[in-house]
Amino acid sequence: MRDETGETQDLEAEEIHPLFHGAPGSTEFRKLRKRLVRETRAAIETYDMIRPGDRWLVCLSGGKDSYTLLAVLHELKWRGLLPVELLACNLDQGQPGFPATVLPEFLTQRQVPHRIEYQDTYSIVKEKVPEGRTYCSLCSRLRRGNLYRIAREEGCQAVVLGHHRDDILETFFMNLFHGGRLASMPPKLLNEEGDLNVLRPLAFVAEADCDRFARAMNYPVIPCDLCGSQEGLQRMQVKRLLDEWESRSPGRRRVMFRALMNVRPSHLPDPKLFDFTALMPDMSDFREKDVPILREH
């Protein structure tokens, strides 16, 4: 929100979005909140995510990351720094034990425009996935298809996800170790149909900060393993590896993420990324000069 002079109010202004009602008053929390807002805003600007007047479908699973995403985006909008319309969306996929009333009550109490949709994709996944295999891959594909459909129905131009810096790093190493390719989650992506952007505004945010924020705000976090399926073994192994590196060398994740933003195609052996055939030395000037012959003694 801006004052009469047009200046953006400081984050510590008394007027706050209802999503921040009950926020701790500690210096530590204020620093965390400012850091989340600063890093999210930086990602939005770096990857040119904003097109004024657009409508964003903000996906809310009930996990710590999506709560953080929702709160920070509304904070930016509240401060006049995000000129888009926000619509929160939860897709209830029919997982057993999913608390169907938690998110509608949470969003209504905090005056957040939202849409709750029920689609029993859980039964489809149970039917299609062999026993002992993880549900995550098929479940995410079905969820993505439904979210794209909802975005179109609601007139949204972007689907906004809560993936953070750690998710991006983990995906990079999973592709490196198990997929044989250098790829991860881009902060901004155009879907195959070309009608929707997929945005990840938390791309610069650490998972630990999302966890601290959601805990401090006492948001009603819903566990992600209600279906009985755990995260894929590969991702868990990569997460443990990154944790070990971080404990041995604090700040390692930050350095690795900076490397993902500093790619040099000419220093990688992929001929599709760089025209190595054009790297031919020009010997014309060299041949015209008298070059002394070195003789062995």
UniProtKB/Swiss-Prot annotation:
Segments crossing the lipid bilayer: none
**What is one process in the GO biological process aspect for this record?**
tRNA thio-modification
Q: Name one GO molecular function term.
A: ATP binding
Q: Which CDD domains match?
A: TtcA-like
Cellular localisation: Cytoplasm
Task: Please tell me one Gene Ontology term that the record gives under cellular component.
Answer: cytoplasm
What Enzyme Commission number(s) appear in the record?
Answer: 2.8.1.-
Q: Which HAMAP family match?
A: TtcA
Beyond the main fields, what else does the record say? Answer: The thiolation reaction likely consists of two steps: a first activation step by ATP to form an adenylated intermediate of the target base of tRNA, and a second nucleophilic substitution step of the sulfur (S) atom supplied by the hydrosulfide attached to the Fe-S cluster.
Q: What is this protein called?
A: tRNA-cytidine(32) 2-sulfurtransferase
Gene of origin? Answer: ttcA
